[in-house]
Amino acid sequence: MSATEHATSLTIAAARAAADKKAEHLAAIDVSERLGLTDVFLLASGANDRHVHAIVDAVDEAMHRAGAKRRTREGFADAHWVLVDYGDVVVHVLQDEYREFYSLERLWKDCPAIELPVDLTRENSRDGAAVGGREDAAS
């Protein structure tokens, strides 16, 4: 079983909202076969607390417009790592140092990547990596 079409379209809507707020290193991972709780993890990086807040707020608004209801939001006060659960999609917005330290891509490397539109990944990645979302594809 792979991520549903609905989960994939929500993921793209969330990724577009994050990209509009200059989120970097966008990656989408299909965790549907490993987790019964959700289909997709969307990962995004923000430069600092204010940037993370702006990304999360934009994603929240886009998901609301798309009809997804937020179940829970964790970590917003500190804004080092914010997790927002929309049921089929869980969005993780991390500051760079936390993203590197926790290395969620590496933890879920056995799960397939969900290809994001090239305009979202190319424009918002500092080093040009992560087209399709997986920076660790060569590792």
Region spans (language model):
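A short beta-alpha structural unit
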Residues: D39-V40, W81
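Long, contiguous binding/interaction regions
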Residues: M1-E33, A47-A54, E61, A66, ...
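Active-site beta-strand-loop-beta-strand hairpin of nuclease catalytic cores
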Residues: V89
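P-loop NTPase catalytic core of nucleic-acid-dependent motor ATPases
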Residues: G36
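Extended, positively charged loop/linker patches that create polyanion-binding surfaces
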Residues: K69
